[in-house]
Amino acid sequence: MMPCSRWNRVALLAGLSVMLAGCGSASRNLASNKGLSGGLWSMRVTSPVLSEGQPIPPKYTADGDNVSPPLKWSHGPSGTSEYVLIVEDADSDRKIPAMHWMVYRLPVGTNELPENAAATGNLIQGRNYKGQNTYTGPDPKKGNTHHYHFQIFALDQSITLPPGATRPELGQALKRGAIAKGKLVATYTR
């Protein structure tokens, strides 16, 4: 793992700012921007139902039960105060990736969410691309394969956002406090 120096953190913030502004680039999601890789500690994201680069089972999509999949992640580095989980469609037709799920203020002792955690009412969730504060499963147009980034961020400070935060609001919080990240990318085709 690589420590986060102040200089690398400045580079991270600059890269994240450009992305959040919606500038078109091949790397539009929060965790895949190359500016984010330098300086952040690496974390591992896993799931008993998802594998890197493999199809998402229909149960976790708009074609199935549309429930959030179970996810696990490695603990963040010393100084982590909470986690943020983001699920984005990197291949969306929008100028920025379609936000499928945002969960924030996850306590530092948490390193997993069970299946259908979005429906429990126990999570602080942000607005997805449909304007709802919950998980919404993959639903690409027929004939298209999309890549879904399941991303975890460790923060060194608490987020004070209320439920229903937007992507830009959460992005600002990540710019201020992200010290580690991890992701798992899975696909879905209709």
Label each region the model flagged:
Residues 2-12:
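Bacterial N-terminal signal peptides that target proteins for export
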Residues 23-190:
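N-terminus-centered regions that define maturation/targeting leaders and the start
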